[in-house]
Amino acid sequence: MNPDVLYEDNHLLVVVKPRNMPIMADDSGDPDLQSGLKAWLKEKYDKPGNVFLGIVHRLDRPVGGVMVLAKTSKAASRLSAQIRDQETGKVYRAIVHGVLENTSGRLRDFLLKDDQTRNVSRVSQNTPGAKEALLDYEVMAHQPGMSMLRIRLQTGRPHQIRVQLAGLGHPIVGDARYGRNTEPGTSIALWCSIMEIDHPVTGARMRFVCDPPAIWPWSVFGSIRER
């Protein structure tokens, strides 16, 4: 693996997660981010034995973008606590079908995950096991039949953005699970563009940014960069 490293120190490793790569080893047997980065660190620093690299947040397999990993157990524990207490910030970009009625807004839903199918559904508030999902969005640009959104998560539920936008009637382009029919090989147009954390040791606020790749459908919108 030759990772795209955004930041590294003794406590953190921040990389750009490639699209269509699982973050951890799974039943598919496909190369995963954690294993690849462990091997890279082991070779880079000539480390004997096992390399610790903790996963503290998740990105769905088809989604790319900023990924923060912990190089020590202490850093992993502190970062996990930040995420649990909603002290981190995460911003995504998405391209959806259609033109939204409002240029900005907040979506509030209640979601329920089916552990057998791993699908997530919008349900009523009083459904047993339902969890509140909140996100804020703004429209960045339009193209014929598509809109680019900037999304800030207020909660971090599985498949949250994908399910909420589909429920709004504007599924993400390329989302084979919750969207419209997609051609084989089409990647989902969802990208984690910003991650904000407090450094687990110094406490300094840190902001990591990366823009989506210049491929379809992102390329249709030109070079719109993050602020």
Question: What are these language model-derived features?
Answer:
Residues 1-227:
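RNA pseudouridine synthases
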